């Protein structure tokens, strides 16, 4: 479920959720997602930024089936919660925003949308961050990390592998099947387990 859900999009999400099979889990990435706890199995997602025992207990008491730990979680905390998911491999979302970069760049309105999936933001180090649009009725955007996180085989948690933005599936197969997964981490490291604790 999207991190940002304007009122105009709630009805559409409600319709989609109402038609899902009972065996489908929903990932609640924001507080509004908890509204479905009485009707569906929920996983607390990255958007809830779960990184302490208080949040885990609160969500568990509410009836959440499982959680995905925050990207800022350190390895020691993750090891204490091996039943939780970690974002293991993928290009993580670094920012969500509702301001439309295409309106700014083109001067066009939503009615004459100039969306292109090739938009990237380039930082001062010449690193390119993809911009992904999420559209229901309205749009919001995600700024995607320029390099994938890879913490594969660093702990015993359940894993979340995000294949969005991978252009070459052979790369992901190499990470998962290679005995050198830890060596690959030097090149494809991310935020997880590099916390500020």
Where are these regions (language model features)?
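Active-site pocket-lining/capping segments in soluble small-molecule metabolic enzymes
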Residues: 1-58, 62-197
């Amino acid at each position: 479920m999207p991190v940002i859900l304007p009122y105009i999009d709630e009805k559409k999400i409600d319709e989609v959720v109402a038609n899902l099979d009972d065996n489908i889990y929903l990932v609640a990435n924001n507080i509004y997602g908890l509204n479905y706890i009485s009707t569906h199995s929920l996983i607390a997602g990255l958007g809830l930024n779960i990184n302490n025992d208080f949040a885990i207990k609160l969500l568990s008491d509410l009836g959440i089936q499982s959680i995905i730990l925050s990207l800022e979680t350190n390895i020691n905390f993750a090891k204490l919660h091996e039943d939780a998911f970690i974002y293991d491999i993928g290009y993580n979302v670094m920012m969500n925003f509702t301001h439309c970069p295409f309106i700014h760049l083109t001067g066009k309105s939503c009615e004459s949308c100039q969306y292109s999936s090739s938009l990237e933001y380039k930082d001062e180090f010449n690193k390119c961050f993809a911009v992904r649009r999420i559209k229901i009725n309205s749009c919001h955007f995600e700024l995607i990390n320029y390099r994938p996180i890879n913490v594969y085989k660093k702990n015993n948690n359940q894993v979340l592998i995000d294949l969005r933005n991978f252009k070459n599936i052979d790369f992901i197969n190499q990470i998962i099947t290679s005995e050198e997964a830890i060596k690959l981490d030097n090149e494809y490291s991310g935020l997880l387990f590099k916390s500020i604790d």
